[in-house]
Each structure stands twice: as C-alpha cells, then as structure tokens.
C-alpha cells in the first residue's frame, strides 16, 4: 500500500475542513482517504474499504499522535489507542526546529487559526531547560503569534534525537530561539531553501 499525504489546501477530492486539518491522504495513487478531526481525541475516517484501515490510521497518527479514537462514517469504532495528555504551552517556551515559514501556507492557515485549541503540536522536552522543541506545526504557531495568541496546545512525543538536535542547533545559529524569530519566505523560496537544507542533511547521513 502506497500512502501519500496531501499537503495542499485546494484539492477537489477532499472536503475543505479535512484539507485544513491535514487529514487528506491518497492511497496507491487513486483512492482518497480522509480523517476529519471532530474533537481533541477523535477523527472520522472516510474510505471506500475499511479492511486494512489500521495501516492508514498509523500513517495519520505519525502526524497527529494526539488523535486516539477513530470512527467510520456511521459512527462505528475502527480503532482506539491510549489517550495522549494534552497541555497548555506558552509560545515563548517553544524552540523551533525549522527556520522558515511558507508565505502561501501562512495565508491558508490564517483562515482557521483563531484560538489556542486550533493549534495542537508535538513537542519534545529540551534538556536542562524549561523549553520545549517543536517537531511540527510551525506555520500554525507563527500564525497564532501574529494574531496575539500566547499559548497553544501541545503533547509530548519522546526525547530529543540526533536530527532534531542538529536542526535546533542550526536554528539557533541563525538567531531563531522562538517562533517569532522565524523568517517568512515566498512559496518558491521556501521550497528551494528548506528542501535543499533537508535534502543535504539526510543525504550526508546516508553517506556516514
């Protein structure tokens, strides 16, 4: 099974709400699968065949581990995991692991980021500090910061690893210590600079 996540906010195969929640996936290049988050722990799964749905759920939870209860479109339980603790976190306590914000993506998320509950992010504790490292959700956090939102919702995803440590070190070398320090770039420049940085890093790891 080949599973690809849809990063666009404009795709006629999926409901707008699903796209905003990053819950759209394409299976084997042709079968749409949607995850519509309905509360802080539950998502409704839309798919043509629920056999083997667990692999799709696991792929979705790679990006949204805080969602632990999955229902089909008739409300029947498909899969349930132990609940994940979600807590309030000050934006200024969060060390980014990225450097740039995509201007187009920022405009898109601005339409639905209104309150802290709209931003739920995976974080890691930063050693020997009261800071946390953000693993994802940088655009939503930057948007929240722009709108004067001071706290977001967060959940822990494990301990700092080598690649996150390197990305954080690079961020700090560039003067990025909090979300508001990140640089907004055009979509084209973001794609070129961020993808090049990631490609070069992971390519060097493969050669080690």
What are these regions (language model features)?
Residues 2-23, 128-208:
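Basic- and aromatic-enriched surface patches that contact anionic nucleotides/nucleic acids
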Residues 4-135, 145:
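Short alpha-helix boundary/capping and kink motifs at helix termini
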